[in-house]
Amino acid sequence: MATQRRDESPSGLSDIVEPDGLLGIGLTSRHIEAFGRKVTSTAGHLMGPITDSSNGGHYHTAMADIHRELRRPTTQRKVFSLTQTTPTDLVRSKLSTSEIQSRALSSLPDELLANIPEDSSSYSLFEGFKATQDDHEFRKAHRRRSSKGKKLLKDGEAAGALPSAPTDLKKERDLLSRRLDLMGVRKNMCSSEIHEIDNKIANLHNMRKIVLDRLAGLEMEEAELEHQLTEIDNKLEDIQEEAPKTPVTAATPKSSAVNDDSFVSEDAAMDASFMSESIYQKLPSHSPRSLKQRSIRKRSMPILHEHFAPGSQIKEMQAHTDMVTAIDFDYPFGTMVSAALDDTVRVWDLNIGRCTGFLEGHNASVRCLQVEDNIVATGSMDASVKLWDLSRARTVTRDNRLNKHEEGEGEDDNASDAFSLFSATTLEDCYVFSLDAHVDEVTALHFRGNTLISGSADKTLRQWDLVKGRCVQTLDVLWAAAQASTLAADTQWRPSGRLPDASADFVGALQCFDAALACGTADGMVRLWDLRSGQVHRSLVGHTGPITCLQFDEVHLVTGSQDRSIRIWDLRMGSIFDAYAYDKPITSMMFDTKRIVAAAGENVVKVYDKADGHHWDCGAGVGADESGPAPATVERVRLKDGYLLEGRKDGTVAAWTC
């Protein structure tokens, strides 16, 4: 039986084939043999000779076409590029563009998903986008419906509008309801953006404050270094000057005595003469000390105040115990000198807000002063003008408590708690000389270079040479006014000046530049003098009250008066360029390149922007609490490079940005 089964299987594979078929899947050797015969037959037809007529012609035609197509260069390049393509690229090339974009947007790496911040919002980003997009589509559809409705009403107003179908109304209602729901999403989006912007602004403000504090510290350190450098330079200059002069001074003491005797005899002769009693010819004796103007080396100017908003307070100091009569400073955050009716003249460091000393020598209150670099000029009610050199200052401790104990009161143990407002020092060695020629109080002064002009209640102006310390010219204001009146009578024209006010200073303000001098007096006239000839070159008529302040530049002259007005004059034409007024008399005024500031009998400083003509207030009175004590009236103002100083009636001095 076994032999018969082997004979039935010609290939002899039946001996190793299991009854269930090859590999247990039902595939027998007979199936494999049949598949092999079919493959052999097909290959024979395809690969057989072309001349064999037994093969089908369509096979040969197909192979010839394929062979011809493969020989083309374009086809060969495509085949070569296909062989260099990775399997991943082959798979991607079978995807459409839309499918690729969908996969790129829908599949994100885990690293990006892990960095998504947590959000407490109840809506998603897609909902917000959809709310914005739907609103745009709604507006377009609303415009289309509105235009169509207008056209129908225009064409058939007589027929009347038919009621819409319920279905259309429901659709409209659903659309409006959906849009109303989306409004909440959009409102939440706007609210979130506002909160985010507020947080960013708060962070920026904090960062700005930190940088401003850093800038303030740098400027304080810079001021200290420059002060130390200036002191060393001054000491070196003094040593170099005294070294060659020491033997000469020691060898000629007798000659000095002779010179001193000659000055004494000359003064005695002048006193014995009639002209010595005249206020026009009285000259002071030569000062033993000469004025040496040492320019302060300023390598960089302070810029801290430029980063504050206009009207911001920088510092406030209780400078005096009575009304401030005069203040001036050299540059922002530099040195300030203040005078008041408490008969003191104080020097301040504006960078730290501390009094560095006193200028003592006047016998009465100081009415006017000017600070230029390290030189200070003060004019007092004792009819004298004194010059001070702050670079020579040497501080000496003194008692300067404001609230001193009365005699008879015992000093308790808490004397250290007494309110001491100032640094208890006095400045010695900074006094240079005194200019004594006026016979009444000095109410105005101005110096530039080696020339100083002073105005007094004795109705004269005096020109001083600061190198020699002598008066070189006296200008009689009354004589000039009389000459103008005589000339006016001859030409049938009379100036419209008024009679001087008894309560006002006869010489209210003055300023000089080279040979030009502008002087404002109590008759409301502004006279322009030529110092070379000693004559009035021009008179500006317009004010109806005493002139209290003035200042000029290359083009304009600005004057303030007790008639409550400030006038801007064009010096080229001699006419009024602009004018404005306040509610009360003007007591002080100054301007820089951008603004004009004035004290007008109120607790604020009046500011006028020259560019746009805008008026605004600056000072402690702006936004002051009405229930509390009101700030004192501003009496004096000074302005340089946007840095404003105000002196009040209660002795307070404050610095502001302007």
Curated annotation (Swiss-Prot):
**Each WD repeat, start to end:** 319-360, 361-398, 437-476, 482-539, 542-581, 583-618, 629-658
**Claim: NADP is one of the keywords in the record:** no
A GO cellular component entry from the record: mitochondrial outer membrane
* CDD domains in UniProt: Mdv1_N (cd22881), WD40 (cd00200)
Record keywords, A-Z: Coiled coil, Membrane, Mitochondrion, Mitochondrion outer membrane, Repeat, WD repeat
On the tree of life, the source organism's domain of life is Eukaryota
Q: Where is this region: Disordered?
A: 138-170
Record carries keyword Coiled coil: yes
The protein's topology relative to the membrane is: Peripheral membrane protein
Q: Which InterPro entries match?
A: G-protein_beta_WD-40_rep, WD40/YVTN_repeat-like_dom_sf, WD40_repeat_CS, WD40_repeat_dom_sf, WD40_rpt
Matching entries from Gene3D superfamilies are given as: 6.10.280.220, YVTN repeat-like/Quinoprotein amine dehydrogenase
One matching Pfam family = WD40
Provide the coiled-coil residue spans: 209-246
Described purpose of this protein according to its UniProt entry = Involved in mitochondrial fission. Acts as an adapter protein required to form mitochondrial fission complexes. Formation of these complexes is required to promote constriction and fission of the mitochondrial compartment at a late step in mitochondrial division.
Under PANTHER family, the record lists: WD REPEAT DOMAIN 5B, WD40 REPEAT PROTEIN
* Protein's recorded name: Mitochondrial division protein 1
